[in-house]
């Protein structure tokens, strides 16, 4: 039996006395593609922040690879999580190539950073990745001159150099037209498969949930109301969580 990568055991989160999450329980296995589904404000982003320990839970325990969230070693596990936000976190004055190079350099081991200036092999790898995300012709463009969809592609390209085990994605298609939204999600799925990563992505879009996940965990009124394999679900059933 495969050991779970992530376990939520009776997890609750409060802020200034107000509940953000209530008694959340689930288990995620390595390599699963999980969708967190629900309306805005139900606690989806808060749940991601609990995983990374950005928010401290009020009750219960989170386990990552068997290490409990109240264990001091849990805070040292942040490098095991890559995070893709709905707003690209890029420097406007960077060239596209430099944004990728900086991420690649940051993920090199210390001895590689010490002795590596900018090896041809890494340069070629960056160009190859930019080609995979359809940005090769934008390599010398400045970030501020890119569209929203192109900026998200740069963020996805940066992920190829991450050494993490879990990819957390928070509404990555916000503000994008439908065609570009699907392209971004397809790139994210492609990346997660290539790196054999566990993927947890947040969306309020039922069709995206059905298309891109193995399993859907739905939140409503701060509580978990559904946890089921995607191939057992229908659009009609999922739409019920949006009705009071």
From Swiss-Prot:
- Give the signal peptide, or none: none
Keywords attached to this Swiss-Prot or TrEMBL record, sorted alphabetically, are: ATP-binding, Nucleotide-binding, Transport
PROSITE patterns (UniProt xref): ABC_TRANSPORTER_1, ABC_TRANSPORTER_2
**What region holds the ABC transporter domain?**
6-241
- Molecular function (Gene Ontology), one example: ATP binding
Q: Does the keyword Nucleus apply?
A: no
Q: Where on this chain does ATP bind? A: 38-45
Any coiled-coil regions, as ranges? none
* One Pfam family here: ABC_tran
Q: What does this protein do?
A: Part of a high-affinity transport system.
What protein family does this chain belong to? Belongs to the ABC transporter superfamily.
Q: What is this protein called?
A: Probable ABC transporter ATP-binding protein p29
Q: Which organism is it from?
A: Mycoplasma pneumoniae (strain ATCC 29342 / M129 / Subtype 1)
């Amino acid at each position: 039996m495969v050991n779970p990568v992530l376990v939520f055991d009776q997890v609750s989160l409060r802020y200034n006395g107000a509940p953000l999450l209530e008694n959340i329980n689930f288990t995620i296995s390595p390599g699963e593609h999980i969708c967190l589904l629900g309306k805005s404000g139900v606690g989806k982003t808060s749940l991601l922040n609990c995983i990374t320990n950005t928010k401290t839970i009020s009750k219960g325990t989170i386990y990552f690879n068997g290490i409990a969230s109240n264990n001091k070693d849990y805070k040292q596990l942040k490098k095991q999580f890559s995070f893709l936000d709905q707003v690209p976190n890029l420097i406007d004055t960077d060239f596209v190539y430099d944004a990728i190079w900086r991420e690649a350099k940051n993920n090199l081991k210390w001895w590689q950073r010490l002795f590596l200036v900018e090896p041809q092999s890494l340069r070629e790898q960056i160009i190859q990745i930019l080609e995979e995300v359809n940005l090769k012709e934008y390599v010398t463009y400045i970030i501020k001159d890119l569209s929203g969809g192109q900026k998200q592609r740069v963020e996805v390209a940066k992920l190829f150099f991450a050494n993490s085990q879990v990819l957390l994605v928070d509404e990555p298609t916000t503000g994008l037209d439908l065609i570009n939204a699907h392209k971004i999600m397809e790139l994210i799925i492609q990346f997660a498969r290539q790196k054999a990563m566990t993927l947890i992505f947040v969306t309020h879009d039922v069709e995206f949930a059905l298309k891109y996940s193995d399993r859907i965990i739905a939140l409503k009124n701060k509580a978990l109301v559904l946890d089921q394999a995607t191939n057992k679900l229908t659009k009609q059933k999922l739409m019920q969580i949006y009705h009071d």
